[in-house]
Amino acid sequence: MSHRLKDGLSLCSAVALGMAISTGYPAGIVAAVGMPIACLTPASRKLAFRNTISYYLAGLWPMVSGAGHFTGSVPIAILFWAGTATLLSAPWALAWTPKRGLHCLWRVILAGIAGIAPPLGLIGFISPMTGAGYLFPGTGWAGLAATALLPGIILALPDSRSRICVRLALPAMVALAVGSHSLAPPEPRPPANWIAVSTHFGDVSRPSQEFAAAQSIQQTVAASSARVLIFPEAMVPRWSNATREFWRQTLAHCRARGQILAIGAGLPRNTVGTTAAAEVDLVKQYDFAAAIRALQVDDHESPPPANPGPDPNASINADPFENTLLIQGAESSTFYQRVPVPIGMWQPFSKRGVPLRLNSPGVIRMDGQRAAVLICYEQVLTYPIVASMLQSPTVLVGISNMYWFADTPIPRYQESALRAWAKLFHIPYLVAENS
């Protein structure tokens, strides 16, 4: 086979793998485990970079429409898409070598680690490591190691000096995969009396929509006999003393019944001089009747107020905030998002937005369980889940607010990835998504 034909086939393979994983289906995630093979087989480093960036551009195409909604700018979304693909391709291009053999193995491993560990891990999308749970279910860290080693071992096949080692390693991995599928017990069920409630509220950032969502959630909590109820990300855009007052009756009801409400909420990092008493006054000043009318009348048909005056929530909404899973009711604690969306939420050169919390705990104790929580963006990365698994969780919880990505495969990829990690470590998982 000529080098030109071989390089062409490897390019087609890289693009096909990227397109497969972009669908978000488990089969595509498994296929992407072969990405290092397609990207490192060309005859030069330049061609290896070409293959790798082609994989990422094909795999990350849903980001363009999704990030366009998030940032409000399609050009910025395209720039982020192309920049992300370029940065993630760099370690694989550096890992390329014209030689084959076991010395190629450590290059593949280092390139894989570079793509999932910070700083690149902060944008470490569509990692080939995600497929470990579908290839080696229930094997935990051994399965993760096998997934990292597998492409390098296959790349070492052409080297005659490596074949004895490869002949031993490759059948061992096949046996591990077959054994894990045939011997693995059924997927574990979530803890008793735990439920995750997915919603269809859309954008809840406006007061009328937030009010409608809050009413629906409160009614769900009141009617449920579950011990733990988990709701999606950002269902309370800003949790403060004012909103706590509005939720007071529901939280008292939860405490009386021994229920735990886990809800996505934004916590202001400062109140810009707004005291707790002043925040409670904001609730008393809030016109809930007007909010209800806004739900019934199309905004475009509603005449603007003659003198709207200052927005009583402006001082809160303008503040930097924490994106959290707030635990209230029979227990009280807060889980902080560790890796928010770069630029859109985490703004390293601004005092606004959500801070990066790489050293924050990845597990929170809730109802006697150790819950590893992944908040939206963290579900498409590898670093947050690996960091959480080091803390021995007993259940995996994913919350997200995906109404702006509803027309993309991203929500499907999130759940497929979450399920893959749950299968790998054989723990139950729950998903609460707002669309």
Model-derived features: positions:
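A short, flexible N-terminal coil/short beta segment enriched in small residues
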Residues: 160-186, 318, 326, 332-344
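Solvent-exposed soluble domains appended to multi-pass membrane proteins
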Residues: 236, 241-243, 250-255, 269-435
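Flexible, charged surface loops at secondary-structure boundaries
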Residues: 43, 72, 188-189, 221-225, ...
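Membrane-embedded alpha-helical bundles of multi-pass enzymes
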Residues: 1-182, 421, 428, 433-434
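Short, conserved active-site loops that position catalytic residues or coordinate cofactors/metal ions
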Residues: 27-36, 55-59, 198, 225-239, ...
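Membrane-interface segments at or immediately adjacent to transmembrane helices
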Residues: 173-260, 269-275, 288-294
